[in-house]
């Protein structure tokens, strides 16, 4: 690894953060190779016989940083959650959680590391754009390496299935455990498409039963809904399409025409080009502009804000919104908000997910990362703590551990059925729906080892109709007939000073420019002019890619 200058302290006084203390007493099927049980070992006594010993006789206390620290290991009533108590007792540990928020976690972690006052275990959440900083931290000796995974079969099994996860090994040593995604059965493909009012599509007679629309069918449907106004908004008041976020436009509207528009593309000869310079990227801009001028796209899309989707969808003005990735949790949030505003309507009769083929007659999507967020150990952590923590991770990524993270305590909250499947034993509410007793306080500590997007699809706490919708959407975009734009880890995490400087904020500049050009009187000329001017600034990045990634 290229030597990076050691980080100097940014502050003079160590930051001391007091979090909630969750104390526990002594310890009284994914396709993983073992169940991860490391609770006992056997050692010979002085007679030559063997006897069981408990490797966790000494109570160890960990400090850990996490978002939602105030919820970690607790119930909504503020009482210790039984699942976390069970875990602490199994490994004879206590945790003090140091609080982070989504707005401060980057800067706060930097402060802790630069002042050598970080907790034992750190939530890093290193995105590719911050990978150079991670390498600098490793080079500065701020993290303790994880032990050889050959001695931890469950961790090794998970690690070997990842590609982006391997980027957190430097010179053959793993310095942060990547929280793996449990969606490998879908090849990590992103299930895009639209959240839309299927009842409106039915009302105008253009609903497709499989809810997969051709490009032309979708354009006609949106136009017809606006014209016929099944929501009774009044002439010209129904919104056809909008994106929920500014960064999703135009990628999830017409991005299938040029899937590399916001990034770089490597040609068959190995050379790299900047996405906006591709001829098909101009076609994306022109097509999006045509849809905008024809009134299919919301007139205020160039100025979209975070609340615009909910306000327009819940009030019955919006027909369809782009989806960056279909999840049960995301759909549940949309439905819950909509249902509050529309108590007389049944959401399962009105809201659904649409898949829209590109102009080539095929669905297209992008491959997602195989991990999200990472947990690093402080370089000052003791050998004993490092071993105990790694043992915990080994259990938590096992089949039993996966079920524990998702369901709770075996034979209390779930059990294996005779056929090996998992039977959920959660209590039911007055409506007969099963209720997750640990929904409040599990994520802050469980996210350290793995994500559970895949579990959502079978989580009985969510309505079956939602789970079925998202499963169908994921099946469509993971199908062999769908064009999948692969994620190449070496490119996604490529970093050096010249490249990082050239691409800083570049993607945002592209989608911001496209939004601005929706009011252009000569969009082809204006787009071409901007791309030509910007290309000179981007060229150093292309040079670095051509020199280092062939």
How would you label these PLM feature ranges?
Residues 6-10, 24-217, 252-255, 261-264, ...:
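Conserved N-terminal structural module of periplasmic/extracytoplasmic solute-binding proteins
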Residues 66-67, 391-516, 521:
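Conserved small-residue motifs centered on glycine
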Residues 70-74, 103-107, 128-132, 183-186, ...:
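Flexible loop/turn segments at secondary-structure boundaries
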Residues 94-100, 299-300, 351-354:
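General small-molecule cofactor/ligand-binding pocket signal
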Residues 173-248, 266-312, 317, 321-324, ...:
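Helix-loop-helix "hinge/cap" segment bordering the ligand-binding cleft or interdomain interface
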């Amino acid at each position: 690894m290229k030597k990076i200058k050691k980080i100097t302290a940014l502050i003079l006084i160590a930051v001391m953060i007091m979090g909630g203390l969750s104390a526990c007493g002594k310890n009284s099927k994914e396709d993983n190779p073992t169940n991860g049980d490391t609770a006992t070992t056997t050692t010979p006594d002085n007679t030559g016989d063997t006897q069981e010993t408990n490797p966790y006789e000494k109570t160890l206390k960990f400090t850990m940083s996490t978002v939602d620290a105030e919820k970690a290991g607790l119930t909504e009533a503020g009482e210790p959650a039984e699942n976390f108590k069970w875990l602490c007792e199994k490994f004879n540990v206590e945790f003090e959680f140091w609080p982070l928020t989504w707005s401060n976690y980057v800067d706060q972690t930097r402060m802790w590391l630069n002042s050598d006052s970080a907790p034992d275990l750190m939530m890093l959440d290193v995105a590719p754009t911050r990978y150079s900083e991670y390498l600098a931290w490793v080079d500065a000796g701020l993290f303790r390496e994880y032990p050889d995974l050959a001695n931890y079969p469950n961790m090794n099994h998970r690690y070997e299935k990842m590609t982006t996860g391997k980027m957190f090994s430097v010179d053959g040593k793993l310095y942060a455990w990547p929280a793996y995604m449990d969606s490998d059965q879908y090849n990590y493909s992103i299930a895009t498409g639209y959240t839309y009012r299927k009842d409106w599509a039915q009302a105008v007679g253009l609903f497709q039963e499989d809810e997969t629309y051709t490009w032309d069918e979708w354009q006609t449907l949106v136009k017809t809904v606006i014209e016929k106004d099944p929501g009774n908004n009044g002439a010209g008041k129904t919104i056809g399409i909008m994106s929920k976020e500014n960064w999703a436009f135009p990628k999830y509207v017409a991005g299938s025409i040029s899937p590399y528009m916001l990034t770089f593309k490597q040609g068959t000869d190995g050379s790299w080009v900047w996405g906006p310079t591709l001829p098909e990227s101009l076609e994306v801009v022109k097509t999006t502009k045509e849809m905008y001028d024809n009134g299919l796209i919301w007139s205020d899309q160039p100025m979209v804000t975070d609340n615009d989707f909910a306000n327009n969808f819940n009030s019955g003005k919006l027909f369809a919104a782009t989806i960056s990735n279909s999840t049960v949790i995301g759909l549940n949030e949309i439905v819950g908000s909509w249902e509050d505003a529309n108590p007389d309507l049944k959401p399962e009769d009105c809201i659904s997910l649409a898949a829209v083929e590109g102009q080539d007659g095929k669905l297209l999507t992008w491959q997602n990362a195989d991990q999200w967020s990472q947990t690093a150990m402080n370089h000052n952590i003791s050998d004993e703590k490092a071993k105990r923590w790694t043992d915990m991770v080994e259990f938590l990524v096992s089949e039993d551990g996966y079920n524990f993270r998702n369901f709770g305590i075996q034979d209390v909250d779930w059990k294996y059925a005779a056929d090996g499947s998992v039977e959920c034993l959660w209590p039911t509410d007055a409506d007969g729906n099963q209720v997750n007793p640990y929904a409040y306080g599990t994520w802050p500590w469980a996210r350290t080892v793995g994500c559970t997007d895949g579990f959502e699809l079978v989580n009985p706490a969510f309505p079956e109709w939602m789970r079925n919708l998202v499963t169908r959407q994921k099946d469509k975009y993971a199908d062999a007939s769908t064009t999948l734009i692969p994620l190449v880890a070496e490119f996604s995490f490529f970093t050096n000073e010249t490249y990082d400087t050239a691409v800083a904020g570049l993607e945002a500049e592209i989608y911001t420019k496209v939004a601005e050009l929706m009011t252009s009187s000569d969009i082809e000329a204006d787009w071409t002019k901007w791309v030509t001017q910007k290309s000179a600034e981007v060229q150093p990045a292309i040079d670095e890619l051509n020199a280092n990634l062939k």
